[in-house]
């Protein structure tokens, strides 16, 4: 069975209709219909400009705009009949417009191609998506600042190689994630600046012979600047790749955070409690409380990484200008944006509800010789070279492993067998509080610095 060629806007050149399977295979309306609002926005701006330069009359413009607004209302009410035989969101809307207002609807596409139309739609859509994502990043950062402020003095072990390294505060750890998200925010803001260039007016690839006013359309659509080259305008997908790159980095950060949350909720760590509403159980093991939200976010990072690689692979072999390959840009881009936004939303809801288990964190920090570096620094202040101090403390740790004693549990006599520079005041250095308070500089883990960083973070968010 074949489609009726008269359904196609380009059917005049063809002597037979498109095969029915090919029509389904090449159609994109099943996924690009989500661009409807931005497609209509672009069409209204285009019609307004055409009237301004005299290609349309004011009456024709008004008829077109009224028709497009009615179509948008139909779509949002679920009353629009999306047709696969019309290929995509653009032709579905144009066909419906012509059905509603007659021949005037056929004038809308004057001076425009689907090539520059879709390039405009995607940029408008992604611009809005980035704004939504930025708001979720800010909301998550607010939750992290709240935890950091409440837990500025809560001591936990810091890790390297997933082994106890030095004591830090839980608040300091939350601020590390705040910093990562700040970079994610900046990358997306930067990406938004570069995508905010208007391709509309590039037409198919070479521009148009009509006396269009691209500056007017640019202003109406809120773009920063008009694109400077028509070939590049219709073929560029750098902005989508750049977004997926920034989204991949953000998802990588969330995946790392997820890994820590999964570890911290486990029976082996028991550092935090997650509320039941963010967890699920097991169909067979009654005791289970599984951290599904962080596990899923960790898993979903792969989808966004895949979107980035998919777009890079899609674009790498394309000559100028537009090619049908570019139809494949939307699904990975849509999925990357959806996944990042939903993951951020889940985290923004979850992070303020985390309950640190103070006693378990402290107990873990007391194990593993977490103040060994503090003892080495103590000896440095006594005039010994750091490398010698490192070796001295290494011997003390070895002794502790053999005797089952932490450094703070050893007597002064035991400690002095490794260096006669060690005096009674060493025990103030070997406490967890002494260790974190000693790191009292910008970026350090001391509670005073955590509180100062929270204030800086609040000021940053307030300025957005």
UniProtKB/Swiss-Prot annotation:
Catalytic activity: 2-(N(omega)-L-arginino)succinate = fumarate + L-arginine
Pathway(s) this gene product operates in, as recorded in its UniProt entry: Amino-acid biosynthesis; L-arginine biosynthesis; L-arginine from L-ornithine and carbamoyl phosphate: step 3/3
Molecular function per GO: argininosuccinate lyase activity
Major localization listed first in the record, in broad terms: cytoplasm
Keyword field: Amino-acid biosynthesis, Arginine biosynthesis, Cytoplasm, Lyase
Highest taxon in the source lineage: Bacteria
Disulfide cross-links: none
This enzyme's EC code(s): 4.3.2.1
GO cellular component, one term: cytosol
Localisation per UniProt entry: Cytoplasm
InterPro entries: Arg_succ_lyase_C (IPR029419), Argininosuccinate_lyase (IPR009049), Fumarase/histidase_N (IPR024083), Fumarate_lyase_CS (IPR020557), Fumarate_lyase_fam (IPR000362), Fumarate_lyase_N (IPR022761), L-Aspartase-like (IPR008948)
GO biological process: arginine biosynthetic process via ornithine; L-arginine biosynthetic process
NCBIfam families xref list: argH (TIGR00838)
Family, similarity comment: Belongs to the lyase 1 family. Argininosuccinate lyase subfamily.
Protein known as: Argininosuccinate lyase
Designated gene of the protein: argH
């Amino acid at each position: 069975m074949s489609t009726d060629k008269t359904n196609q806007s380009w059917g005049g050149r063809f002597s037979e209709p498109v095969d029915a399977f090919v029509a389904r295979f090449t159609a994109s309306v099943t996924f690009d219909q989500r661009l409807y609002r931005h497609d209509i926005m672009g069409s209204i701006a285009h019609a307004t400009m055409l009237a301004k330069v005299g290609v349309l009359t004011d009456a024709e413009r008004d008829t077109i705009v009224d028709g497009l607004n009615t179509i948008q209302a139909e779509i949002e009410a679920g009353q629009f009949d999306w047709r696969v035989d019309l290929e995509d969101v653009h032709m579905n809307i144009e066909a419906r417009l012509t059905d509603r207002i007659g021949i005037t609807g056929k004038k809308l596409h004057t001076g425009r191609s689907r090539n520059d139309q879709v390039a405009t739609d995607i940029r408008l859509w992604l611009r809005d998506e980035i704004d939504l994502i930025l708001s979720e990043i800010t909301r998550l950062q607010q939750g992290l600042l709240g935890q950091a402020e409440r837990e500025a003095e809560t001591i936990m072990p810091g890790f390297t190689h997933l082994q106890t390294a030095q004591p830090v505060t839980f608040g300091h750890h939350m601020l590390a994630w705040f910093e990562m998200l700040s970079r994610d925010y900046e990358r997306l803001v930067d990406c938004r600046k570069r995508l905010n260039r208007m391709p509309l007016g590039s037409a198919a690839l070479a521009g148009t012979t009509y006396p269009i006013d691209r500056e007017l359309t640019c202003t109406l659509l809120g773009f920063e600047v008009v694109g400077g080259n028509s070939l590049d305008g219709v073929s560029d997908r750098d902005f989508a790749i750049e977004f997926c790159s920034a989204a991949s980095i953000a998802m990588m950060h969330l995946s790392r955070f997820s890994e820590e949350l999964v570890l911290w909720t486990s029976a082996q760590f028991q550092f935090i409690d997650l509320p039941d509403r963010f967890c699920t159980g097991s169909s067979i093991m009654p005791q289970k409380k599984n951290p599904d939200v962080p596990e899923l976010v960790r898993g979903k990072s792969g989808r966004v990484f895949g979107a980035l690689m998919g777009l890079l692979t899609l674009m790498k072999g394309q000559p100028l200008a537009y090619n049908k390959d570019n139809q494949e840009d939307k699904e990975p881009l849509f999925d990357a944006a959806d996944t990042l936004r939903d993951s951020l939303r889940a985290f923004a809801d979850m992070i303020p509800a985390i309950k640190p288990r103070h006693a378990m964190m402290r107990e873990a920090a007391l194990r593993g010789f977490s103040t060994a570096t503090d003892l080495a620094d103590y000896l440095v202040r006594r005039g010994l070279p750091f490398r010698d101090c490192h070796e001295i403390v290494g011997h003390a740790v070895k002794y502790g492993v053999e005797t089952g004693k932490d450094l703070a549990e050893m007597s002064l006599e035991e400690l002095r067998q490794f260096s006669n520079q060690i005096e009674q005041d060493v025990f103030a250095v070997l406490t967890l509080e002494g260790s974190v308070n000693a790191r009292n500089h910008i970026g350090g883990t001391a509670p005073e610095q955590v509180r100062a960083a929270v204030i800086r973070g609040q000021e940053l968010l307030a300025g957005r």
